[in-house]
């Protein structure tokens, strides 16, 4: 488990330049460049895809009289939802899928009263078509926006703020990424280093996809009165 400063020092060795002493020393242009490149690297890896390290689960329960639920109020480290991982669990723990845009438009025009709960994701919010019953449990998976660990407390953070911060991502990937970015920033040829990084990135990301969570949002009937992707709930009297 290497800190961001240790990784940058290894990059400096590979680039045959002076090692940085303090990434947050604003009086050292060399150190400032390493910090800028490290931040760019971590931000880029966050945006690349749904890493297992960033995948988290969460839930909330509906409240009487409330139709909209901002996601960042449920999970402060929210970056984006994972596709096909939002489900409704009723009091009998039945699992069903979220409403599609086509279903939403149809229901807005031709809605008939019934025992159905339907919602969509809009502007970072869960928006229900009709006011849902109280205490309906919505579960979902999302990508966290955290990029580093605090070395002392192991707390996840979404900002690189200390020399001792530890990247959440694979340290070898981070080193390769910082290396080619540093070379590019300094006007040097970086094609070989960039290609090596891309190969390792795809290899690592592909391995993580092989162990990702199983999606339960299949099509078809999964239980009597519960239709996957049609968001139908039949409550027992």
Located regions from the model:
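Glycine-enriched, solvent-exposed interface loops adjoining structured elements
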Residues: 1-237
């Amino acid at each position: 488990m290497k800190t961001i400063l240790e990784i940058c020092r290894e990059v400096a060795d590979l680039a045959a330049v002076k090692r940085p002493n303090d990434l947050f020393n604003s009086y050292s242009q060399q150190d400032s460049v390493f910090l800028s490149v490290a931040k760019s690297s971590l931000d880029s890896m966050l945006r690349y895809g749904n890493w297992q390290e960033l995948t988290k689960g969460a839930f909330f329960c509906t409240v009487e009289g409330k139709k909209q639920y901002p996601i960042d109020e449920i999970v402060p480290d929210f970056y984006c939802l994972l596709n096909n991982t939002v489900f409704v669990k009723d009091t009998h723990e039945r699992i069903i899928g979220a409403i599609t845009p086509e279903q939403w438009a149809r229901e807005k025009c031709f809605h008939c009263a019934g025992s159905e709960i339907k919602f969509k994701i809009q502007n970072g919010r869960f928006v229900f078509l009709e006011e849902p019953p109280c205490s309906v449990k919505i579960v979902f998976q999302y990508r966290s926006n955290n990029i580093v660990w605090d070395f002392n407390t192991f707390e996840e953070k979404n900002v690189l703020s200390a020399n001792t911060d530890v990247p959440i991502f694979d340290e070898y990937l981070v080193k390769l990424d910082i290396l080619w970015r540093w070379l590019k920033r300094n006007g040097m040829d970086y094609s070989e280093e960039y290609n090596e990084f891309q190969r390792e990135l795809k290899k690592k990301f592909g391995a993580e996809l092989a162990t990702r969570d199983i999606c339960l949002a299949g099509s078809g009937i999964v239980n009597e009165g519960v239709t996957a992707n049609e968001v139908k709930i039949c409550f027992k009297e």
